[in-house]
């Protein structure tokens, strides 16, 4: 694909810091172990280079490694593309259809979302991937998806090498008996014997690499199918969630309207071409998008504003009655709170007695919300939001009516 024609560019050397994270360290470690062991097993014990098949096999292994690493680093260092700081639409009246990001001090372009990890508004944000320590979005979606495709394919090849190496070295002969047909693989062994014997250490290492290869094939293969489903529908993971909430909002308030997702062009091929191009550069500029008939540039952002307003209506005000340090699994808040801590990268927030929180969602023993600050609406002041134990707060009696919208508001929505 055209992704291979693109050039990895470093805006600055700070991008190299993305490698100093557990995600890339594990990912690159798995790639290194599987590719290195596949080459060693092939050359020493299974398919020697002096045979035609062995040479072709070795070249294919190198090719898999190069393509996997290229798309991996492309996805990591090219990045998703960020909305320019201070961005606003050309027509000033259009700002009424957009949300404002206080951190970036810019309006959120259609399909963009603010990432807490990257601390920027990301174009066509799908998710923040810990394995590349970057977001998956507009500019790197193709490279990321190709990596998800190539990694399982390379691991399947490597797994075949591992299995055949262990089989031929342990049994010295491989035969399939179908009536009178026999396939003799004994020629795959070195004659004379290899310089390095296939001992216990080699067997254990090959078996470990086989486990990594099979696990990667299953896990990354599933992620590839999820991403292809997203691409063919031209709908990111976040946008799928927005669409579901739109349907819930319409059903909850019994509205006489239908939400139509604006970016699905009605053709899987047209949706596919927006991400994968021969030039390696995705269609558009990441700020404006082609939409289906009957929709416009702000169809989705208007729905987001409606959901945000609905979120404020449904939010509940709480007062902090116990201090909370912000620990991930606080044992001093009870055993149930400790073991039911949310499995998410979303932050926990410190609480001090007397503070007020506006909770928007929650679990049985945990709540998620924003601290109510006097200067929370001043431009440039970041919101303080995250998870906290439910037992640390109590509902404010005067705000009990905010648990659900008044009937009058439901009719007006």
UniProtKB/Swiss-Prot annotation:
Q: How does it sit in the membrane?
A: Multi-pass membrane protein
Q: What is its main location?
A: endoplasmic reticulum
Q: Which residues lie on this side of the membrane: Cytoplasmic?
A: 1-24, 79-143, 227-413
Q: Which residues cross the membrane?
A: 25-45, 58-78, 144-164, 206-226
- GO CC term (a single one): endoplasmic reticulum
Catalytic activity, per the record?
A: L-cysteinyl-[protein] + hexadecanoyl-CoA = S-hexadecanoyl-L-cysteinyl-[protein] + CoA; L-cysteinyl-[protein] + octadecanoyl-CoA = S-octadecanoyl-L-cysteinyl-[protein] + CoA
Query: What InterPro entries is this protein classified in?
Result: Palmitoyltrfase_DHHC, PFA4/ZDH16/20/ERF2-like, SH3_domain
Q: Report whether Cytoplasm shows up as a keyword of the record.
A: no
Keyword Endoplasmic reticulum on entry = yes
Q: What is this protein called?
A: Palmitoyltransferase ZDHHC6
- Source species: Homo sapiens
């Amino acid at each position: 694909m055209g992704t291979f024609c693109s050039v990895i560019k470093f805006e600055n050397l700070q991008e190299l810091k993305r490698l100093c994270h557990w995600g890339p360290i594990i990912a690159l470690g798995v790639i290194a172990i599987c590719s290195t062991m596949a080459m060693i097993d092939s050359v020493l014990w299974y398919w020697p280079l002096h045979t035609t098949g062995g040479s072709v096999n070795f070249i294919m292994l190198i090719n898999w490694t190069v393509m996997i690493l290229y798309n991996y680093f492309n996805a990591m260092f090219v990045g998703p593309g960020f909305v320019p700081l201070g961005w606003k639409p050309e027509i000033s009246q259009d700002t009424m259809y957009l949300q404002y990001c206080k951190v970036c001090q810019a309006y959120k372009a259609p399909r963009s979302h603010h990432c807490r990890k990257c601390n920027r508004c990301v174009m066509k944000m799908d998710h923040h991937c810990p394995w590349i320590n970057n977001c998956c979005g507009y500019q790197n979606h193709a490279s990321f998806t190709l990596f998800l495709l190539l990694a399982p394919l390379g691991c399947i090849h490597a797994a075949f090498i591992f299995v055949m190496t262990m089989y031929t070295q342990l049994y010295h002969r491989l035969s399939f008996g179908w009536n009178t047909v026999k396939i003799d693989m004994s020629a795959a062994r070195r004659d004379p014997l290899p310089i390095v014997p296939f001992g216990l250490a080699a067997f254990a290492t090959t078996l470990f690499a086989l486990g990594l290869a099979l696990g990667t094939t299953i896990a990354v293969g599933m992620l590839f199918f999820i991403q292809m489903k997203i691409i063919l529908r031209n709908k990111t993971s976040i946008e799928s969630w927005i669409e579901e909430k739109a349907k819930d909002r319409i059903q909850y308030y019994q509205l006489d309207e239908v939400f139509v997702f604006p970016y699905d062009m009605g053709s899987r091929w047209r949706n596919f071409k927006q991400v994968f191009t021969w030039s390696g550069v995705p269609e558009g500029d990441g700020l404006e998008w082609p939409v289906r008939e009957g929709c416009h540039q702000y169809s989705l952002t208007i729905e987001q504003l409606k959901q945000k307003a609905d979120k404020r209506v449904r939010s509940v005000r709480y007062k902090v009655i116990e201090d909370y340090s912000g620990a991930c699994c606080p044992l001093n808040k009870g055993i149930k709170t400790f073991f039911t801590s949310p499995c998410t990268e979303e932050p926990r927030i410190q609480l001090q007695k007397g503070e007020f929180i506006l909770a928007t969602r929650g679990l049985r023993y945990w709540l998620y919300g924003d601290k109510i600050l006097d200067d929370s609406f001043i431009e440039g002041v970041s919101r303080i939001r995250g998870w906290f134990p439910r037992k640390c707060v109590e509902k404010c009696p005067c705000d009990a009516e905010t648990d659900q919208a008044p009937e009058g508001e439901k009719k007006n929505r």
